[in-house]
């Protein structure tokens, strides 16, 4: 179970990105975080796995406090958090197979990881997952040869091979066309359900959130203004979430202020 308690993030500029955010994600539920650009959605997801350091508050994964860990212990807990990025976060010059197997770096020594020497069982599992996400036969293609939808499927495969306790997903459809977006969401929720892994999903498109999530968390100005079922998300609550009028709750997606992807492989 993921537990977030009173999380707060204030940037050096003084901007408050998160203000007393608390939530839990458990079982095999899919929880979608919605809100306008700048509401703190990406910051929340990245604070959970410490890609962004929170100012205060705590994050727990099962009985382990993530926020209290020293840097050298972070690889072990990140291994339990499958992260799927908005901009894919693939190593462009590496093959599809090599990118997927990077999800196993937390399970091998630094030397083996550097030489990309993985146990045969990991390789076999990677082939199985690639077939599952519809990329069979592309394992030797470089990542920079793939379409956006294919790249996101590689990201999903990499997260799944980690055998995570939770999947953290940051705007998985923002760079995709509507049809590909639905294909990716179908795949993501199907695999998460089959694996019995909960999903915390930051997503801009409210329609997709309502269709695919079990629960909605609405953020506005860094605070939770709604946490409940998809059925309970009515027009009044949407207006409360998007009250600043910066964008329509069900408009086409626009990018949240940039948070640079960490392109290092986290072990």
Swiss-Prot record:
**Entry annotated with the keyword Membrane:** yes
Region entry Disordered, spans: 243-267
Q: Which top EC class is named for this enzyme in its record?
A: translocase
Instruction: Give every ABC transporter domain span.
Output: 2-246
| Gene Ontology molecular function terms on file | ABC-type phosphonate transporter activity; ATP binding; ATP hydrolysis activity
Question: Which CDD domains does the record cross-reference, listed alphabetically?
Answer: ABC_PhnC_transporter
Kindly list the positions annotated as binding ATP: 35-42
Q: Which InterPro entries match?
A: AAA+_ATPase, ABC_transporter-like_ATP-bd, ABC_transporter-like_CS, ABC_transpr_PhnC, MetN_ABC_transporter-like, P-loop_NTPase
Q: What does this protein do?
A: Part of the ABC transporter complex PhnCDE involved in phosphonates import. Responsible for energy coupling to the transport system.
The record's subunit annotation is:
The complex is composed of two ATP-binding proteins (PhnC), two transmembrane proteins (PhnE) and a solute-binding protein (PhnD).
Q: Please state what the protein is called.
A: Phosphonates import ATP-binding protein PhnC 2
Q: Which organism is it from?
A: Natronomonas pharaonis (strain ATCC 35678 / DSM 2160 / CIP 103997 / JCM 8858 / NBRC 14720 / NCIMB 2260 / Gabara) (Halobacterium pharaonis)
């Amino acid at each position: 179970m993921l537990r977030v308690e009173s999380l707060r993030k204030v940037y050096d500029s003084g901007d408050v990105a998160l203000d007393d955010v608390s939530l839990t994600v458990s079982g095999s539920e899919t929880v979608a975080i919605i809100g306008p650009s700048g509401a703190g959605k990406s910051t929340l997801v990245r604070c959970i796995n410490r890609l962004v350091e929170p100012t205060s508050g705590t994050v727990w994964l099962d009985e382990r406090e993530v926020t209290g860990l020293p840097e050298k212990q972070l690889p072990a807990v990140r291994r339990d958090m499958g992260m799927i990025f908005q901009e894919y976060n693939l190593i462009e010059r590496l093959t599809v197979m090599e990118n997927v197997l990077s999800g196993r770096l937390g399970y091998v020594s630094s030397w083996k990881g550097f030489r990309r020497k993985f146990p045969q069982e990991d390789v076999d599992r990677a082939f199985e997952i690639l077939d599952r996400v519809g990329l069979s036969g592309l394992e030797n293609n470089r990542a920079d040869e793939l379409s956006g939808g294919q790249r996101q499927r590689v990201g999903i495969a990499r997260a799944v091979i980690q055998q995570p306790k939770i999947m953290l997903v940051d705007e998985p459809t923002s760079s995709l066309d509507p049809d590909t977006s639905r294909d990716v969401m179908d795949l993501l929720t199907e695999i998460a359900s089959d694996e019995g892994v909960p999903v915390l999903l930051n997503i801009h498109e409210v329609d997709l959130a309502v269709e695919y999530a079990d629960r909605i968390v609405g953020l506005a100005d860094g605070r939770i203004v709604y946490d409940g079922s998809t059925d309970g998300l009515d027009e009044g609550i949407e207006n409360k979430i998007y009250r600043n009028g910066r964008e329509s709750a069900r408009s086409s997606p626009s990018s949240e202020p940039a948070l640079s992807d960490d392109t290092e492989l986290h072990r």
